[in-house]
A protein has these predicted regions:
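Small-residue-rich hydrophobic transmembrane alpha-helices
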Residues: 54-114, 151-170, 281-341, 345-347, ...
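Residue-level signal for short hydrophobic patches within transmembrane helices
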Residues: 17-36, 40, 63-70, 146, ...
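Transmembrane alpha-helical segments of integral membrane proteins
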Residues: 409-418
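Short alpha-helical transmembrane segments in multi-pass integral membrane proteins
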Residues: 1-24, 82-149, 191-246, 309-374, ...
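Short runs within selected transmembrane alpha-helices of multi-pass transporters and secretion channels
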Residues: 144-162, 170-178, 199-212, 299-302, ...
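Transmembrane alpha-helix boundary and packing residues in multipass membrane permease domains
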Residues: 27, 31, 43, 80, ...
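Helix-terminus/linker motif at the lipid-water interface of multi-pass membrane proteins
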Residues: 36-54, 124-131, 187-194, 256-287, ...
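Transmembrane helical elements of multi-pass membrane transporters/channels
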Residues: 22-41, 143, 177, 206-210, ...
Length: 455
């Protein structure tokens, strides 16, 4: 029997708009849930601990980004390899991609936890922690690090479960942990007054429960059956998965590097301004995480696009690939435009959600929102287009595009502009990098659609 005509999934036949909504909505929910872990902690910490607590979560944020980077490396990489193989009818080979990816997700999480706990204080100082924030950051990060293997497994396996044709299951796994985290945050931080430790413990418990659900559903796949031999690590399998997951992973690693440089710059140039060290770090941390909610919507769309484009490209249905990309980009633009309007017109109301502060605190926050995120309305192009190239088996293009904003444009601007403009230079680096990265993405995808398969 032809494996492509069994009940694997309808990726090659159903209307692409219907498929994108079917896969993107659970992906968006999953990404929102991942962002809300940080947002919920920020909310309760801001209202019960204060500015120093908010600054502490921003100092530890590079480690959270590291977790997402690993999850995307083996999650999107494994899902893309799986769908490309299934599209070609290579079902037996496809199952190895899921098994190997799941093992690598958890194993890398254990390694990251070990490194973090062994070098906790040096890492936090390297990330730019001021002295008056360090104790808060150590308490929070030392506990949250225990949950890294479960966070990475849950986030990465969500892509594998979606690739198996079960996007709603992936959404349920993530949503369950987030709801539990929110309830426990309210109990531990607001009621029991456990501060930073309470927020961290709530986060870890939610992640462990989500990981348990993921393990159950991975062991009961819809289109393939995972056996013990599929869990044995194969160099060739991991190499293929890693090549396809490099683009989204590189983007996260670049984001982590930028976050570290950003924290150090905010600390240094903040000390030379009227704001001091802590206010810029606390404000930038909140705004970064609010922006992550917007980016979660965009990344969710790109992840929902991935199985559709991978399968149809493997099956040589190029018109469906192009149609899916264009519809995803249209959805991304609408979301980006709404985010732009919110960031420009109600920044004070947004920042007030996370607690009160001095007038200097609000002054910096409002300026940072309006300037740094000015080109939000074109920020959808880079993540959607980068993931598109990866999903059709062109990881080099995807990787290059994923690094344009963070490494090619933003990082040099963060170093150069503040030399002439002080802390304002940090703010203006954002829109310049966003505009240039969007232009590169448009040029690359326009060139791709001029090639023979798509004409």
């Amino acid at each position: 029997m032809n494996t492509q005509t069994t009940n694997e999934n309808p990726l090659g036949s159903q209307p692409v708009k219907k498929l994108l909504m079917q896969f993107a909505i659970p992906s968006i929910v999953a990404m929102l849930v991942s962002s809300l872990y940080n947002i919920v902690d920020q909310f309760f910490i801001g209202r019960n601990v204060g500015e120093l607590g908010n600054a502490a979560t921003n100092i530890s944020f590079p480690l959270s980004i590291s977790c997402i980077a690993i999850a995307l490396l083996f999650g999107i990489g494994g899902a893309s390899a799986f769908n490309l193989a299934m599209g070609k009818g290579e079902k037996e080979k496809a199952v190895y991609y899921i098994g190997n990816s799941a093992v690598m997700l958890f194993g890398c999480g254990v390694i990251l936890t070990t490194i973090t706990l062994l070098f906790l204080e040096p890492l936090l100082r390297f990330f730019g922690s001021p002295d008056n924030v360090l104790s808060y950051a150590k308490t929070y990060t030392g506990i949250v690090a225990i949950g890294f293997p479960f966070l990475i497994l849950t986030t990465g396996s969500g892509h594998l479960i979606r690739a198996d044709g079960r996007p709603k299951i992936s959404m349920i796994c993530n949503l369950t942990g987030a709801v539990i985290n929110t309830i426990l945050d309210a109990l531990f931080v607001s009621v029991l007054q456990m501060g930073m430790a309470g927020a961290a413990i709530a986060t870890v418990i939610g992640q462990v429960i989500s990981a348990g659900l993921v393990i159950w559903f991975l062991s009961h796949c819809k289109t393939v059956t995972i056996r013990k031999e599929h869990l044995r690590i194969s160099r060739s399998i991991i190499a293929r998965v890693s090549s396809l997951g490099t683009a989204p992973c590189s983007n996260q690693l670049a984001m982590m590097l930028v976050q570290i440089i950003m924290n150090k710059s905010l600390k240094y140039y903040g000390s030379l301004s009227i704001y001091g060290e802590a206010i810029p770090i606390a404000c930038a941390g909140i705004i970064t995480k609010v922006n992550q909610v917007f980016l979660s919507l965009i990344i969710g769309i790109s992840q929902g696009l991935q199985p559709i484009t991978s399968y149809n490209y493997g099956a040589e249905k190029y018109k469906r690939v192009k149609s899916a990309y264009l519809f995803a980009s249209t959805c991304g633009f609408v979301i980006a435009l709404i985010a732009f309007l919110l960031f420009q017109f109600v920044p004070r109301q947004i920042i007030s959600i996370f607690g009160n502060g001095s007038e200097s605190y609000f002054q910096f926050s409002i300026s940072y929102f309006r300037i740094f995120l000015f080109f939000t309305f074109i920020n959808f192009m880079q993540p959607i287009t980068s993931n598109f190239f990866t999903s059709i088996g062109k990881p080099k293009k995807g990787t290059f595009l994923s690094l344009t904003r963070q490494i090619l444009f933003l990082l040099p601007l963060l170093i150069i502009l503040p030399l002439f403009m002080g802390i304002d230079g940090i703010m203006y680096s954002g829109p310049i990098a966003d505009g240039l990265a969007g232009a590169v993405a448009i040029f690359m995808v326009w060139n791709e659609f001029r090639t023979r398969p798509f004409r």
